[in-house]
């Protein structure tokens, strides 16, 4: 496959901010971020203004998604029982009004890490009760009891990314489109006061009508919030980019999604699921 050259609209200017302070805090508290692990293109912007998406439950994922830069391992390290406290301290010291917390998929754990998510929410609420806590969770292998554990912690937003259209789900090793959709539906049914959110990457070879069908599926299961962004391959070893989607198409899809009833939509080439996360709350 011919390697696509990045168009002009993806030549992002890197802002100069106080990144060193953020990196120092993360190092001091021994915390991971998906910003660093996934090579997020917005890391300079977010770190520069004191924002980060925290990665709990270790740095290793038990699945082999071909688009993702997070490390893989069949048996990652056991959860760090002190991690929730340290993350809460970071939230307090950064004075965050909105925090996003995610994790690798942990199929090796009986509850998929749900209890650790709940403990982290509780720790943040104890020291910073006014902070909105958004959780971006894996599919927990379809375990409804694990989902119930997370919902019982009462996060401000429960997010789970569909990532792409059903036809291309081979890039999500071990995942299932219907199972992911069911998680969002179950969350909306079990805890209607907690809004749900999902994200889709464009540029993997999907057709526009396939994306529209996914948006309709999300609204059918009660999903409130949506992010749409351009897939960028972390390296030549990862899933290649099939197409660079022009900004005008992101604008079109945002307008169509809002017309379907999504409460808030972030749509653009550099949008990621936690980018401008406070705009959803």
Swiss-Prot record:
Domain Radical SAM core, first and last residues per copy: 47-263
Name this protein carries in UniProt: Lipoyl synthase
InterPro entries assigned to the protein according to its UniProt record, in alphabetical order: Aldolase_TIM, Elp3/MiaA/NifB-like_rSAM, Lipoyl_synth, rSAM
GO cellular component terms, semicolon-separated: cytoplasm
Residues reported to bind [4Fe-4S] cluster 2: 61, 65, 68
Localization, UniProt: Cytoplasm
Family stated for the protein in its record: Belongs to the radical SAM superfamily. Lipoyl synthase family.
Cofactors demanded by this protein: [4Fe-4S] cluster
Residues noted as binding [4Fe-4S] cluster 1 in the record, renumbered to the chain: 35, 40, 46, 274
Metal-binding listed as a keyword: yes
Cofactor note: Binds 2 [4Fe-4S] clusters per subunit. One cluster is coordinated with 3 cysteines and an exchangeable S-adenosyl-L-methionine.
A molecular function (GO) term: lipoate synthase activity
Keyword Iron-sulfur: yes
Keywords carried by this UniProt record: 4Fe-4S, Cytoplasm, Iron, Iron-sulfur, Metal-binding, S-adenosyl-L-methionine, Transferase
Catalytic reactions on record: [[Fe-S] cluster scaffold protein carrying a second [4Fe-4S](2+) cluster] + N(6)-octanoyl-L-lysyl-[protein] + 2 oxidized [2Fe-2S]-[ferredoxin] + 2 S-adenosyl-L-methionine + 4 H(+) = [[Fe-S] cluster scaffold protein] + N(6)-[(R)-dihydrolipoyl]-L-lysyl-[protein] + 4 Fe(3+) + 2 hydrogen sulfide + 2 5'-deoxyadenosine + 2 L-methionine + 2 reduced [2Fe-2S]-[ferredoxin]
Pfam family for this entry, one: Radical_SAM
First-tier enzyme category under EC: transferase
Coiled-coil segments on the chain, per record: none
PROSITE patterns linked to this entry: RADICAL_SAM
Pathway: Protein modification; protein lipoylation via endogenous pathway; protein N(6)-(lipoyl)lysine from octanoyl-[acyl-carrier-protein]: step 2/2
EC number per UniProt: 2.8.1.8
Gene: lipA
């Amino acid at each position: 496959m011919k390697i696509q050259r990045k168009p002009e609209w993806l030549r992002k200017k890197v802002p100069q901010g106080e990144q060193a302070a953020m990196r120092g805090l993360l190092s001091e508290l021994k915390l991971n971020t998906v910003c660093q692990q996934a090579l997020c293109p917005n890391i300079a912007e977010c770190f520069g203004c004191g924002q980060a998406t925290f990665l709990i439950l270790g740095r290793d994922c038990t699945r082999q998604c071909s688009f993702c830069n997070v490390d893989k391992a069949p048996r990652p390290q056991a959860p760090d029982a002190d991690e929730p406290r340290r993350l809460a301290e970071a939230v307090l010291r950064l004075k965050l009004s909105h925090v996003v917390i995610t994790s690798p998929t942990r199929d090796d754990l009986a509850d998929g890490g749900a209890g650790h998510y709940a403990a982290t929410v509780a720790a943040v609420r104890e020291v910073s009760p006014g902070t909105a806590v958004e959780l971006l969770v894996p599919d927990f292998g379809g375990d409804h009891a694990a989902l119930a554990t997370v919902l019982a912690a009462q996060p401000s937003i429960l997010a789970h990314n569909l990532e792409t259209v059903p036809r291309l789900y081979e890039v999500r090793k071990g995942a299932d489109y219907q199972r992911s959709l069911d998680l969002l539906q179950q969350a909306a049914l079990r805890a209607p006061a907690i809004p749900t959110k999902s994200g889709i990457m464009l540029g993997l070879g999907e057709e526009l009508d396939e994306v529209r069908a996914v948006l309709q599926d999300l609204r059918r299961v009660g999903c409130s919030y949506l992010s749409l962004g351009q897939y960028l391959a972390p390296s030549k070893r990862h899933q290649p980019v099939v197409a660079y989607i022009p900004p005008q198409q992101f604008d079109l899809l945002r307008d169509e999604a809002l017309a379907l009833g999504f409460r808030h939509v972030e749509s653009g080439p550099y949008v990621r699921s936690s980018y401008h996360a406070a705009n959803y709350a």
